UniProtKB/Swiss-Prot annotation:
EC code: 3.6.1.27
Organism classification: Bacteria, Bacillati, Cyanobacteriota, Cyanophyceae, Synechococcales
GO molecular function, one term: undecaprenyl-diphosphatase activity
One Pfam family in the UniProt entry: BacA
Other remarks in the entry: Bacitracin is thought to be involved in the inhibition of peptidoglycan synthesis by sequestering undecaprenyl diphosphate, thereby reducing the pool of lipid carrier available.
Function according to Swiss-Prot or TrEMBL: Catalyzes the dephosphorylation of undecaprenyl diphosphate (UPP). Confers resistance to bacitracin.
Designated name of the protein: Undecaprenyl-diphosphatase
InterPro entries referenced in this protein's UniProt entry, alphabetically: UppP (IPR003824)
Enzyme class: hydrolase
Gene: uppP
Length: 276
């Protein structure tokens, strides 16, 4: 029920926006951290709706950071459409992004219709964090990292999009699972990250707008607005850092972190300082 939803105060909203911004594009799951961080501080769970709305700040950061890339992508696709050149790089990339968005839209609608929201129990978060860490580690080992962004097509987009649908499970991480899928397609790490960011644009927009409309409450506007603003600022810095990091390093630091994070949650549940 809407009446049971907790809305953060102004400084709590800024803190949660910071957590969202830092973790959204790192392969460590923003949803998981937005579930665990408040629990450690003794705050109630703000819920999936609040998390989805403040993701619009992360979306704004992506749009600004990749403004030049998006402009070239859209102009190139428009020219390809005019020429009916459907093998052109920009057209294939755009179609891959659009097709890759369909699985998470369909899965998200199904989850909403059947269960109302994805499971948010901490044991689910912990298991998903460790499970995706193992998958990402496997992708690091077997991925050949020989393809760039311009080699991607519609089939690649569908494959990564199917993986993205798993991000509805808290703890999986949208960026983590799409990065894993892209590495398994032999993409270079920085190219895989860029594709993950671009593929996330429609998903973040649709989820944020849908939840804002469905769960609209006037008393939530201040906390949502401050959380979104904070998420925007920290997301921009996170994007820039991750792109630079993956140009020179692997994802193993995130793999180790995810395993440690998952084990910490299980330990907290076992000792009682975290509640399911």
């Amino acid at each position: 029920m809407l009446a049971d939803i907790w809305y953060p105060n102004w400084w709590q909203a800024l803190v949660l926006g910071m957590v969202q911004g830092i973790t959204e594009f790192l392969p460590i799951s923003s949803t998981a951290h937005l579930r665990v961080f408040p629990a450690l501080l003794g705050w109630p769970d703000a819920g999936a709706s609040f998390a989805a709305v403040i993701q619009l700040g992360s979306l704004g950061a992506v749009l600004i950071y990749f403004a030049s890339d998006l402009r070239q992508l859209l102009l190139g696709s428009w020219k390809a459409w005019q020429k009916r050149d459907f093998q052109e790089e920009s057209w294939r990339l755009l179609m891959g992004i659009l097709v890759g968005t369909l699985p998470i839209v369909i899965a998200g609608w199904a989850v909403k219709a059947i269960w109302g929201s994805p499971p948010r129990q901490l044991w689910v978060v912990a298991a998903a964090a460790i499970g995706l860490a193992l998958a990402l580690g496997w992708a690091e080992r077997v991925g050949k990292r020989r393809r760039d962004l311009h080699s991607l097509g519609i089939g690649d987009g569908l494959w990564v999009g199917l993986a993205q649908a798993l991000a509805l499970i808290p703890g999986v991480s949208r960026s983590g699972v799409t990065l894993t899928a892209a590495l398994l397609l032999d993409l270079q790490r920085s190219a895989a990250a860029r594709y993950s960011f671009l593929l996330g644009i429609p998903a973040l927009f649709l989820a944020g707008v849908a939840e804002f409309i469905a769960e609209f409450r006037a008393e939530a506007l201040l906390s949502q607005g401050l959380g979104t603003l904070s998420a925007f600022v920290f997301s921009y810095g996170s994007i820039d850092w991750l792109i630079r990091f993956l140009q020179r390093s692997s994802t193993w630091v995130f793999i180790v972190y995810r395993i440690g994070f998952g084990l910490f949650i299980f330990l907290g549940l076992a000792l009682g300082f975290l509640q399911p």
